[in-house]
Regions:
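A cross-family phosphate/adenosyl-ligand binding-site feature
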Residues: 1-163
Length: 163
């Protein structure tokens, strides 16, 4: 019997998030249970109800209150797709001001695979903090794979298959 694979999928506000349902379909076909958390801005770009119906779990944006049950099962892997300039820089610095960043920060100490799939404008990749923060995340065992310009979700699914 194979072990259940649960992916905590964090989504950020970059154009690929508009097609995140396609990635979720592919991940589910590959045997993943997908639990979605969105940054506050990404939450305004996506259809949270449709994605909750697709995954079977609520799309989380806000922290739960003390005593409230955890709405998602424990993750066996975490991925941030698309990972934006803002989230990469905040995450690398340990900033924990949103649920999405909280999940990413906790994942670094959880002993599970963590993947980042950046989608960042070329001008922003030239910013001096970007490379430094990507290296910092890689040093913390985050697997970094830039999203291809043609947005082939199979790249992400392939990388996560071995998580």
């Amino acid at each position: 019997m194979s072990q259940s694979r649960v992916l905590a999928l964090v989504v950020c506000a970059a154009p690929p998030v508009l097609r995140i349902a396609e990635l979720i379909d592919l991940l589910q076909e590959d045997g993943w249970t997908v639990c979605l958390t969105a940054t506050p801005t990404a939450a305004t770009w996506i259809d949270r109800e449709a994605l909750a119906a697709q995954t079977g779990y609520p799309v989380r944006v806000e922290w739960r209150k003390p005593g409230e049950p955890e709405p998602h099962p424990p993750a066996t892997a975490v991925a941030v797709v698309p990972a934006t300039f803002n989230v990469i820089n905040k995450w690398a610095q340990g900033i924990n001001d949103t649920l999405a960043l909280g999940i990413l920060n906790e994942a670094l100490g959880a002993g599970i695979p963590v993947h980042a799939f950046p989608n960042v404008k070329e001008q922003l990749t030239a910013h001096p903090s970007y490379d430094r923060h990507l290296r910092s995340l890689q040093d913390a065992a985050v697997a970094v794979t830039p999203l291809p310009a043609e947005l082939d979700w199979h790249t992400a699914v392939h990388r996560l298959r071995f998580a």
